Amino acid sequence: MEQKFIKIFDGLKRDYGYAEITNGYKDSTTGKFKVKHGWAGKQLTSADYLEHLKGEKSIGIQPCDDNGMVSFGAIDIDSKAYQDFSPRKYLEIIEKNNLPVVPVRSKSGGLHLYVHTKEKVKASFLRNFLDKLLYTLE
């Protein structure tokens, strides 16, 4: 499973994002779950992926490699009032339009929509697709 996950989320290798989810808190104004996050400052390894899959650490892969190519991308669907956010509206639009995305509930309570390609494409191409997708969902 680990190797398949690495292949599906193949992106920047020289660095990766992290989030300290065990030290998070809920923002009293927005209801959003907030965590300390940033760049790890080191190369991504198979061990990092495995620890992520085991739930031992939270990592974020930058989709764009050093050549400006991607095999996946994501958009974040958020609400200003997280406690009132319901993904149902978006899931219905995705299903009705047979959109090629994988919806995943985010740590903060929003929704991430992932799109994957069979081969690497220019990041700008996928970014344009995601922008149009976001417009469709609003």
Regions found by a protein language model. Name each.
Residues M1-F72, K80-Y90:
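DNA replication initiation on ssDNA origins
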Residues N23, N67, N97-N98, N128:
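Detector for Asparagine
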Residues Q62-G68, E95-K96, V102-K107:
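Short glycine/proline-enriched loop/turn "hinge" motifs that connect secondary-structure elements
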Residues Q83-K96, H116-E138:
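Helical (often loop-to-helix) elements that flank the catalytic cores of nucleotide-handling enzymes
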